[in-house]
Amino acid sequence: MEILPAIDLLDGACVRLHKGDYEQVTRFSDDPVAQALSWQQQGATRLHLVDLDGAKRGEPVNDSAVQAITSALDIPVQLGGGVRSLERAEQLLACGLDRVILGTVAIEQPDLVRSLAERYPGRIVVGIDAKDGRVATRGWIEQSDVLATDLARTFSSSGIAAIITTDIATDGTLAGPNLEALRTMAASSSVPVIASGGIGCMADLLSLLPLEPLGVSGVIVGRALYDGRVDLAEAVRALAEPRLQDITAVAADLA
């Protein structure tokens, strides 16, 4: 299972939001390039970027920081937040990003997502952010009536690389992942699922391992890394070489 360190960009700085609330911001670093290089040096195999300004406003704000990060790193970088047009997606892919993540546009213009997935195989990811099982859009500001699992099913045969599913209620809380929601999401789609939200310790990461055979292929971690609750190098080793006793113990707890 792949672990993806997250860098959330707001006004050019690395921050974290609590449950997606733009009024509850914790600032971790004013140098996102240095932070990205640190994650790479600690063993990250892919970096996850979120343009929070773009997600909220629907327009690019942090492009200079994104360009600097992709230029400095050797590992692939993916980005989401405010990618709501064909032109914007192609612009980002051309600037060195390995993957772009489409969230709001996936519910508003699903045909655009399919078109991009066909044009750029393996480089388009759908981000499904959910609260109480229903999709939230536009930087989590708006709540829809669409079930997250229904949206996932619509992209099962579209050619997208993965689905990133974020449980808004646990994001930034360190309270642990919503395992049942992840299990349901994985069962709803034939494409790999990447978990996001709630990771607070190594045990939380290990709790995801029984879901890997169901299709949960990766996990995004943010605040737990910045707070020092999870050591990235240790986490990379643990998820790359699952320890049978840990998986068995967690599986027993889930049963």
Swiss-Prot record:
GO terms for cellular component: cytoplasm. Keywords: Amino-acid biosynthesis, Cytoplasm, Histidine biosynthesis, Isomerase. One of its GO terms (molecular function) is 1-(5-phosphoribosyl)-5-[(5-phosphoribosylamino)methylideneamino]imidazole-4-carboxamide isomerase activity. Disulfide bonds: none annotated. It is an enzyme of class 5 (isomerase). This is 1-(5-phosphoribosyl)-5-[(5-phosphoribosylamino)methylideneamino] imidazole-4-carboxamide isomerase. InterPro entries: Aldolase_TIM, His_biosynth, HisA_bact_arch, Isoase_HisA-like, Isoase_HisA-like_bact, RibuloseP-bd_barrel. GO terms for biological process: L-histidine biosynthetic process; L-tryptophan biosynthetic process. CDD domains: HisA (cd04732). The lineage of its organism: Bacteria, Bacillati, Cyanobacteriota, Cyanophyceae, Synechococcales. Belongs to the HisA/HisF family. Pathway: Amino-acid biosynthesis; L-histidine biosynthesis; L-histidine from 5-phospho-alpha-D-ribose 1-diphosphate: step 4/9. It is found in: Cytoplasm. Its main location: cytoplasm. Pfam families: His_biosynth. Its EC number is 5.3.1.16. The active site is at D8, D129. It catalyses: 1-(5-phospho-beta-D-ribosyl)-5-[(5-phospho-beta-D-ribosylamino)methylideneamino]imidazole-4-carboxamide = 5-[(5-phospho-1-deoxy-D-ribulos-1-ylimino)methylamino]-1-(5-phospho-beta-D-ribosyl)imidazole-4-carboxamide.
